[in-house]
A protein has these predicted regions:
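Conserved PLP-binding active-site segment in aminotransferase class I/II-type PLP enzymes
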Residues: 1-64, 68-69, 89-90
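PLP-dependent aminotransferase-like
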Residues: 63-105
């Protein structure tokens, strides 16, 4: 079986989450700004906006890329529903590309 969607949590990740949960800020505040600055530094960008989940991020990508009606966007069928939904939400059409049964690539 190929593990699909399994997360890996390290002790320092868990400690960081607990520390943040005990802070006065949960959904915004200094940790979000710190996270955005670290991403800018790591990837060499000019701007970064952290969002609440991957679905929101995918929808923003569609807007940023200017997807519109009659655009065909190729994606994998082996993904969460949000992958195709963000394409439809941006008025484009998802086109599913086949995957290999042996290794799901």
């Amino acid at each position: 079986m190929i593990n699909y969607g399994k997360q890996t949590l390290k002790d320092n990740d868990i400690k960081a989450v607990i520390k943040t949960l005990k802070n006065d800020f949960l959904t915004s505040g200094p940790k979000v700004e710190e996270f955005e600055k670290e991403l800018i530094k790591k990837f060499g960008g000019k701007f970064c906006s952290a969002v609440n989940n991957g679905t929101s991020a995918l929808n923003i990508i569609g807007k940023a890329l200017g997807w519109k009606k009659n655009d065909n966007i190729v994606t994998t069928p082996l993904s969460f529903l949000a992958t195709a939904n963000c394409i439809v939400n941006n008025n484009a059409t998802p086109i599913f590309s086949d995957v290999e049964n042996e290794n799901l690539t």
